[in-house]
From Swiss-Prot:
Miscellaneous information on this protein: There are 2 genes for uL1 in S.pombe.
Name by which UniProt lists this protein: Large ribosomal subunit protein uL1B
GO molecular function: RNA binding; structural constituent of ribosome
InterPro entries xrefs: eL8/uL1-like, Ribosomal_uL1, Ribosomal_uL1-like, Ribosomal_uL1/biogenesis, Ribosomal_uL1_3-a/b-sand, Ribosomal_uL1_CS
Subcellular compartments: Cytoplasm
Protein species of origin: Schizosaccharomyces pombe (strain 972 / ATCC 24843)
Cited function: Component of the ribosome, a large ribonucleoprotein complex responsible for the synthesis of proteins in the cell. The small ribosomal subunit (SSU) binds messenger RNAs (mRNAs) and translates the encoded message by selecting cognate aminoacyl-transfer RNA (tRNA) molecules. The large subunit (LSU) contains the ribosomal catalytic site termed the peptidyl transferase center (PTC), which catalyzes the formation of peptide bonds, thereby polymerizing the amino acids delivered by tRNAs into a polypeptide chain.
Keyword Ribonucleoprotein: yes
This protein's encoding gene: rpl101
GO cellular component, one term: cytosolic large ribosomal subunit
Positions of modified residues (Phosphoserine): 11
Length: 216
């Protein structure tokens, strides 16, 4: 049973949107869900990791790069999406610094299905280490549909510290869109936790420059 009601999410979302209206920034603020865990020992308990696709794209400006074969490079070019060929990847020569720079430049990668197995061989473990191993796309898939899917997907991953944050939307969204994203993100997170709600110390939502609003 969810301990966060739609009504409480709504009132917090209203305040976030009102705050961002009053203080307009020259960029679109992201809305983030910040989670504080309790009764969890990252050394002993299983470190969870899970991804979920939200109903509304939380980060429309995400920088995405296609690692493609000829067919997908062509599709990317037509759509004005950044892309790299196998030859481009070979030029990086597994240089750790260059791969790291590539991983920093983009928020996510999509690779042609036929290339996915070659990525570690071409680039080494750099993309995996950055948590940005590419999502596969087949020739039958709609490339733009895939890009939207990647932009809609958020990842909860517990590392060594008991707090984590994920983007659940932005201030240009409607109230309903933000509420839908936040509710789904919260309930999915709880499903990943060993003791569910008993592991949640706090849930806070805030826009990039706005005040934090406590949900739980």
């Amino acid at each position: 049973m969810s301990k966060v009601s739609v009504a409480s999410v709504r009132s917090n979302v209203e305040q976030i949107l009102k705050g961002s209206e009053e203080k307009k920034r020259n960029f679109t603020e992201t809305v983030e869900l910040q989670i504080g865990l309790k009764n969890y020992d990252p050394q002993r308990d299983k470190r969870f990791s899970g991804t979920i696709k939200l109903p509304n794209v939380p980060r429309p400006n995400m920088a995405i790069c296609i690692l493609g074969d000829a067919h997908d490079l062509d599709r990317a070019k037509h759509g004005g999406v950044d892309a790299m060929s196998v030859d481009d990847l070979k030029k990086l020569n597994k240089n750790k610094k260059l791969v790291k720079k590539l991983a920093k430049k983009y928020d996510a990668f999509i690779a042609s299905e036929v290339l996915i197995k070659q990525i570690p061989r071409l680039l080494g473990p750099g993309l995996s280490k950055a948590g940005k191993f590419p999502s596969p796309v087949s020739h039958a898939d709609d490339l733009y549909g895939k890009i939207t899917e990647v932009k809609s997907t958020i990842k909860f991953q517990l590392k060594k510290v008991l707090c984590l944050g994920v983007a659940v939307g932005h201030v240009e969204m409607s109230e309903e869109q933000l509420i839908a994203n936040i509710m789904l993100a919260v309930n999915f997170l709880v499903s990943l936790l060993k003791k569910g709600w008993q592991n949640i110390g706090s849930l806070v939502v805030k826009s990039t420059m706005g005040k934090p609003h406590r949900l739980y």
